[in-house]
Amino acid sequence: MQFLNTFSKSRISWLLLLLCIVFFEGSALFFQHGMKLGPCVMCIYERVAMMGIAFAALLGAIAPQYAIIRWAGLIAWGYSAVRGLQLSIEHVGYQFNPSPFATCDLFVQFPNWAPLNKWVPWMFEAYGNCAEVVWTFLGQSMPQWLVIIFAGNLVALALIVIAQFFSKKTNTILDM
């Protein structure tokens, strides 16, 4: 735990998290533009959750040695990973438990103050079907892989949060 405590206070740990998210976002863009797999509304929302983790990584990388910055990054990471897990579980439900009464929206709905689909349509515009399985790897669909990825983020986060309470002892004159 001491290692994770020390590691979380280094900029490299937060940049490593950012690098992982850049890889996942790059993969998503490759699927969209390279393989011509149209993202659905849930895919876009899951992408935004990934971006939230990227934001958390950037926040934590600012000054990880300061507890307030580190905890802000950890909280943002946790919120984004939980929301991403919720969205991807819901998406798996649309794919494997189809119902005419449970469908995703036809269009992404962002707040008026941040219409990401208008600002960056090549990344945030949805035109796929949430219930359609368009790609699998090792027998898992894309949202199933996202469940694994977001759950993995939460496991890593839990370990790092627990490690925050295991700081290195400092020697005092009374310890000698």
Curated annotation (Swiss-Prot):
Disulfide bonds join 40-43, 104-130. One of its GO terms (molecular function) is protein-disulfide reductase activity. It is found in: Cell inner membrane. Residues 1-13, 65-71, 164-176 are cytoplasmic. Keywords: Cell inner membrane, Cell membrane, Chaperone, Disulfide bond, Electron transport, Membrane, Oxidoreductase, Redox-active center, Transmembrane, Transmembrane helix, Transport. It is a multi-pass membrane protein. Required for disulfide bond formation in some periplasmic proteins. Acts by oxidizing the DsbA protein. This is Disulfide bond formation protein B. It comes from Photobacterium profundum (strain SS9).
